[in-house]
Amino acid sequence: QRIGMTDTSHPIYKGIFEYLSSEKDLTDYGWRFNVPENNNYPRAPWWNYSEDANKTESIGPTCGLCAFILQNMDKTSSVYKKAETLAKQALDNLLTAKNFGDMGIGGYIGLIDALPTLNIGDYDMPALYSKINELVNASIERDVNKWQYYGVLPSTYIHSPQSPFYPANKDIVDQEI
C-alpha cells in the first residue's frame, strides 16, 4: 500500500488473500517468522527454524499481516476473526513487552497506523505512539560507522519527512540520505 498498489482484484492481492485464508503457518501466537522447511536449504543462521524464536520474531509479521487482513479481507472469515484477536493481543502487550524481535517495531507501526480505521477497540493512541516513538528512537543505530553492518538505519522506520518519527530524528536521517 505504501507504493500505491491498492487494487485488491490484482492477482498479487488474490494470491495473498488465498495464502492468508489457508491459515498456513498461523499459530496461536501469530504467523511464523520461519518455517521447518527452511532447514532443508542453505540459509543465514537467523532463518534456522526455531519455534522459540518464532514466538518473538513473529511479532512484526503478525502485526503487519493483521493490519492488512483487517483492512482488506472479509470480516466474516475465520482468518479475519483470528487477526482481530491477534491484533488486540499485540496492542494490549505493547506497553509492557520487553522483546519485539527484529521486525516487531515496524509491524507495530503498521498496525497502529491502521488502528483508527479498524474499529477493534478503544486504545490510548497517544500512549501507543509514545511507546513506538521510544522504541524507534532506541533502536536506530546512531553510530554511522556501524551502518555497514547489520543494524537499524533511520530509513527502516522513517520513510518521509511526514513520518511522526522524523522530527526527533531529522539529523540522523539527513546523514543517511
Language-model-derived ranges and their functions:
Residues 1-177:
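Preference for long, amphipathic alpha-helical scaffolds in soluble/luminal domains
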